[in-house]
């Protein structure tokens, strides 16, 4: 399941990006959060790796190559022994949490409302069922990393190298079809949110476009306040932002 989720995780930011504004200005990326996320670990890059986790075939391989890898680098930097060989030091977009018998997904930048959080959970579970049942040839890790970097920059319109599409939007529509085919009845009630997000744009893309449009007739600060006010209401009223 880890490897299938690693595959999917490269494309989730295209739908979930929510951080278009940086210090009161339109940021250079669709997903500015993930760009800064990479930069936070420049002193010990192996802690975050390529954000997309490496494929592994066993827990032993994961512990040796991933946890062991960044622990060696931390030791070279003089880190205290209490920080070495700890799973919680791993900051990839997906990681094992052995203490919880779980996989933790950090790559999402979803900041909308609880209903949308549930929609993403339903979508991810259903896609995983489909990927596990299809047992497809995995997309290479290098392609996933390249596609993620393109998505961080350009969102759903990013050019990608996935076998199911030339753009992130096309790949996400493929995943949506797979999700719908494998979703439970209760999960399907939430999937319309994901479908509409893929069709109309991530929160970041919507906010970016609306702020730039408002800024044509008002100050940039006023434009930001005008656009973000309805988003605040979405959180308090538990409704998706479209």
Predicted regions and their residues:
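Short amphipathic alpha-helices in soluble, non-transmembrane regions
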Residues: 2-5
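C-terminal accessory/tail domains of diverse enzymes
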Residues: 7, 14, 18-242
């Amino acid at each position: 399941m880890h490897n299938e989720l690693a595959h999917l995780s490269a494309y989730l930011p295209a739908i979930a990006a929510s951080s278009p504004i940086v210090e009161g200005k339109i940021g250079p990326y669709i997903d500015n959060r993930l760009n800064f996320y990479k930069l936070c670990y420049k002193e010990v890059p192996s802690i975050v790796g390529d954000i997309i986790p490496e494929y592994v075939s066993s827990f032993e391989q994961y512990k040796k190559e991933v946890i062991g890898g960044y622990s060696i680098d931390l030791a070279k930097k003089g880190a205290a022994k209490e920080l070495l060989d700890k799973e919680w030091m791993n900051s990839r977009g997906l990681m094992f949490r052995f203490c919880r018998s779980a996989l933790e997904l950090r790559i999402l930048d979803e900041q909308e409302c609880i209903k949308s959080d549930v929609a993403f959970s339903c979508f991810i579970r259903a896609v995983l069922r489909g990927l596990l049942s299809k047992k497809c040839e995995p997309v290479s890790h290098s392609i996933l990393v390249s596609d993620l970097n393109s998505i961080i920059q350009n969102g759903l319109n990013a050019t990608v190298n996935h076998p199911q599409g030339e753009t992130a939007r096309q790949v996400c529509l493929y995943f949506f079809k797979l999700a719908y085919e494998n979703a439970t009845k209760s999960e399907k009630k939430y999937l319309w949110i994901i479908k509409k997000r893929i069709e109309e744009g991530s929160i970041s893309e919507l906010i970016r476009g609306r702020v730039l449009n408002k800024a044509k007739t008002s100050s940039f600060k006023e434009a930001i306040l005008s656009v973000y006010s309805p988003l605040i209401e979405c959180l308090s009223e538990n409704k998706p932002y479209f």
